[in-house]
C-alpha cells in the first residue's frame, strides 16, 4: 500500500531536487551549516516537490497509459483513485509549504510557490501538451529548489541566486531532451510535442550543444563574481567539457538512443557532483550583491 503512494511522488525526481536544494544551501552556508535549518529546508522542499509530482500523475493519466515506461503507474492501473491522490497531494503540499513559511523564510516559500505553480499549471496542464517550448517552462520549476536552498540561508535573492537559477534551468534543457530522444517512441505515441518529436533529433542535438555552452558560461559567473574558488573553476569546467564532448559526438552517433542515454546519465552525474561540490568550493567571505 505505502509503496504505491511512494511511487506517486516520483522518488527519482525527489532525489534529484533534494541534491540540488542541498547544493544551493551549501553554496550560501560557506561552511557554516545550520543543520536544523538544512533539515527543515530539505523536508519542506521535498514535500512540496512530492505534492507537485502527485498532481502531475493525476493530470497525466491519459498520457501515461500510452507510454511504455509509465503505463504501470498506480493511477493508470487504477490501484489509487484520482481523488485519493489529490488528497494525498494536498496533505503533502500543506506540510511542505507550512515548513517553508513558518520555519525557513518567505524567500524560500515564494520560490516553492513559483516552482509548484509553474510545474502543475503552466507545464503539466498546458505547455506539455501544446507547445514545443514546454521544456523551457518546465525548467523554471526545476531550477527553483537550489534557489530555495540558497535563500534559506541568505534571506535575500542576490547575484549568486540568479546565476544558479539560470544555470540549473539551462541544465534542464539537454537533460530533458536526452530523455526524449532515448524514449522517442514513447513521446511520439503519447503525442507530446517535445523538440525531438515536434522538430527533429538533429535540431535537438544542435540546441543541446548551445544550452551546454550557455550553462557553462553562466556557472562560470559564480567564480567571476567571487562566490566560488579556483578548484570549482577547474573541476566544473573539466566536467562540463566532457558533457560538451558527449554532445558533439552525438552528431556522428550510429544509435541516437544509446547516445542520448549516455548524455542523460552524465547530466545526472554532473549536476550531482556540482551540487555536492558547493560544500567545499565556496569562496568565503562571499560578496554581498543583493538584487531583492
UniProtKB/Swiss-Prot annotation:
Catalytic activity: heme b + (2E,6E)-farnesyl diphosphate + H2O = Fe(II)-heme o + diphosphate
Name of the featured protein: Protoheme IX farnesyltransferase
CDD domains in UniProt: PT_UbiA_Cox10
EC class: transferase
Principal location: membrane
Gene from which the chain derives: cyoE
Membrane topology: Multi-pass membrane protein
One Pfam family of this chain: UbiA
Other facts noted in the record for this chain: Carbon 2 of the heme B porphyrin ring is defined according to the Fischer nomenclature.
Organism: Acinetobacter baylyi (strain ATCC 33305 / BD413 / ADP1)
Organismal lineage: Bacteria, Pseudomonadati, Pseudomonadota, Gammaproteobacteria, Moraxellales
Stored PANTHER family: PROTOHEME IX FARNESYLTRANSFERASE, MITOCHONDRIAL
Amino acid at each position: 500500500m505505502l509503496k504505491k503512494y511512494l511511487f506517486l511522488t516520483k522518488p527519482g525526481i525527489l532525489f534529484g531536487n533534494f541534491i540540488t536544494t542541498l547544493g544551493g544551501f551549501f553554496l550560501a552556508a560557506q561552511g557554516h551549516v545550520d543543520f536544523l535549518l538544512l533539515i527543515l529546508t530539505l523536508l519542506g522542499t521535498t514535500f512540496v516537490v512530492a505534492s507537485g509530482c502527485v498532481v502531475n500523475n493525476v493530470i497525466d493519466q491519459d498520457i501515461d497509459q500510452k507510454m511504455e515506461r509509465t503505463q504501470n503507474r498506480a493511477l493508470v492501473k487504477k490501484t489509487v483513485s484520482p481523488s485519493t491522490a489529490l488528497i494525498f497531494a494536498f496533505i503533502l503540499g500543506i506540510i511542505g509549504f507550512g515548513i517553508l513559511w513558518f520555519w525557513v523564510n518567505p524567500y524560500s516559500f515564494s520560490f516553492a510557490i513559483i516552482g509548484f505553480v509553474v510545474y502543475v499549471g503552466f507545464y503539466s496542464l498546458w505547455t506539455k501538451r501544446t507547445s514545443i517550448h514546454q521544456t523551457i517552462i518546465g525548467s523554471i520549476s526545476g531550477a527553483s529548489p537550489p534557489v530555495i536552498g540558497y535563500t534559506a540561508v541568505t534571506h535575500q535573492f542576490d547575484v549568486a541566486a540568479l546565476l544558479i537559477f539560470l544555470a540549473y534551468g539551462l541544465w534542464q534543457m539537454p537533460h530533458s531532451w536526452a530523455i526524449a530522444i532515448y524514449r522517442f517512441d514513447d513521446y511520439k505515441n503519447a503525442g507530446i510535442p517535445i523538440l525531438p518529436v515536434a522538430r527533429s533529433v538533429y535540431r535537438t542535438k544542435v540546441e543541446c550543444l548551445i544550452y551546454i555552452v550557455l550553462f557553462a558560461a553562466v556557472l562560470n559567473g559564480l567564480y567571476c563574481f567571487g562566490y566560488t574558488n579556483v578548484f570549482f573553476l577547474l573541476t566544473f569546467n573539466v566536467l562540463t567539457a566532457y558533457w560538451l564532448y558527449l554532445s558533439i559526438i552525438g552528431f556522428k552517433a550510429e544509435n541516437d538512443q544509446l547516445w542520448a542515454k549516455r548524455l542523460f546519465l552524465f547530466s545526472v552525474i554532473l549536476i550531482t557532483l556540482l551540487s555536492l561540490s558547493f560544500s567545499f568550493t565556496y569562496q568565503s567571505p562571499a560578496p554581498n550583491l543583493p538584487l531583492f
